[in-house]
Amino acid sequence: MPTYRSFLSAFVFCTHILWLAFSSALAANDDASIRQELDFNFDWKFSLGEHSGAQVPAFDDSSWRDLRLPHDWSIEAEYSQENTSGATGYLPGGLGWYRKHFATPELANGEVAKTQILFDGIYNHSEVWINGHSLGYRPFGYVAFYYDLTPFLNTDGSDNVIAVHVDRSRYVDSRWYTGSGIYRNVKLVVTGEVHVPIWGTTILTPEVTSERAKVLISTELRNDSEQARVVNVSTTLLDDSGLNIGRDMKRLEIAARSTELLRQEVIVANPQLWDIDNPNLYFAQTEVRSEEQLLDSKSTRLGIRSLRNDAKTGFFLNGRNVKIKGVNLHHDAGLVGAAVPIGVWKRRLEVLKEAGVNAIRTGHKPASKEFIELCDEMGFLVQQETFDEWERPKNKRRNGRHQGEIDYIEQGYSEFFTEWAEKDLTAIIRRDINNPSIFQWSIGNEIEWSYPRYIPATGYFGKNGKSK
């Protein structure tokens, strides 16, 4: 009888073949400068523990375990009360290394493509290297982030090596089970020099009725070349069947090594509104052209809906008074740990929908992108949470108020809040600003337990998500 491991090996092999086929097609395609957002979860090497020099490309990882992401190494370990904290599941943390070898993506003309790696979440304290060059460090385990690989990619035909170090030695750093490792999806984003940056599109619907809706599209356009470029930018609004609903086109010049912000508007007659009962979705297809050459093409999913709160009568969705019937969902799922298959989330949400639930609070931190997209599709309202700690820590062993000193293994986000909170909050909002399911952002969970500093924190939202 085939085993799970043999099935997984076969799956990984087939995925690798598809990647090779894609690479060949990329080189032969006249429109190869069009963006590709590639599944980068396959063909990773992993080893638990510390390995000196593992960021160096020549490091021998042949004995390391082969795996496909997402991956949570803590759930694979044995439960033990020696791990001291029931809050994090009596499971260990530790140190882990991931490595991946891959070829340099190329455009049709043979030039090296603009290549970025997008992580949806690594728990936690991650540092990423490409070919021995450190790209950066992120302490927060629930935030998406990306790095530009382009300057460090090999151009001589040799493989590149991505190395990721994860430090989960602070294994009592939360009041719930966190997991450890690259537990969310990874993508490789390949574009030309002129492109829409990752999270470079913001779509708002400031005027919505059943007869008419105004859709405002703000698009960042980046020119990484050494010369100015004049481009035509068209954004077409499509319904879920692909029907053209409306279009706006503008022409602009982008100086060398610079970014421009373009604003466009589409009026939609008789819009199909996004609602908890009928979660209708649209797509904004943005194309960037120079003369007849397609430089970039990016699709952004959205929903047309209006949100309003009234202190006396409550919440209104599309002008209709809706009673919020919500639950709190953490990011793990029992025996699969923190690396939750999308099918598990779909089943959970189906059961909750049958029970009459219409809203989810992502306790007590941001959910994965695929979870938010599933809520878009299934008609759930989402309150996206951010942090469980600000500047003062909580005592995780007692799962409550600050009591006594916090030791090393209990150090959580409070140690990094001052330096990282605004950066992380910006990333959280920019990633999810276009998801129609999100109707509220929360700046912190039970923060009165640590330090009441609401005014400066809400100032971050004024720069990022005020209209949301």
Tell me what each language-model feature is.
Residues 9-23:
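Bacterial N-terminal signal peptides
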Residues 28-118, 174-182:
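Extended carbohydrate-recognition surfaces in non-catalytic/accessory domains of CAZymes
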Residues 149-151, 263-274:
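Short, hydrophobic beta-strand segments
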Residues 130, 212-253, 260-264:
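Beta-strand-rich binding/interaction modules
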Residues 142-146, 150-151, 172, 306-468:
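Active-site mouth of glycoside hydrolases
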Residues 167-174, 289-295, 319:
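Short acidic/polar inter-strand loop motif in beta-rich domains
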Residues 38, 50, 93-199, 225, ...:
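Accessory beta-strand-rich segments of carbohydrate-active enzymes
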Residues 46, 102-104, 134, 166, ...:
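Hydrophobic beta-strand positions in extracellular immunoglobulin-like domains
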